[in-house]
From Swiss-Prot:
Domain of life: Eukaryota
Function (record text): Inhibits voltage-dependent potassium channels (Kv1/KCNA). Inhibits the binding of 125I-alpha-dendrotoxin to rat synaptosomal membranes (IC(50)=22 nM).
Record organism: Actinia equina (Beadlet anemone)
Protein's UniProt name: Kappa-actitoxin-Aeq4a
Disulfide-bonded cysteines: C2-C36, C11-C29, C20-C33
GO cellular component terms, semicolon-separated: extracellular region; nematocyst
Major localisation: secreted
Transmembrane segments: none
Length: 36
């Protein structure tokens, strides 16, 4: 499945700060980071 395990607000900041390359965030913010 494709979902964000972290809060939407957290993932929004992750994407805004270009942190989707981090394995932790790519996994836990999969939907927001588009890693589906």
């Amino acid at each position: 499945g494709c979902k964000d395990n972290f809060s939407a607000n957290t993932c929004k900041h992750v994407k805004a700060n270009n942190n989707c390359g981090s394995q932790k965030y790519a996994t836990n913010c999969a939907k927001t980071c588009g890693k589906c």
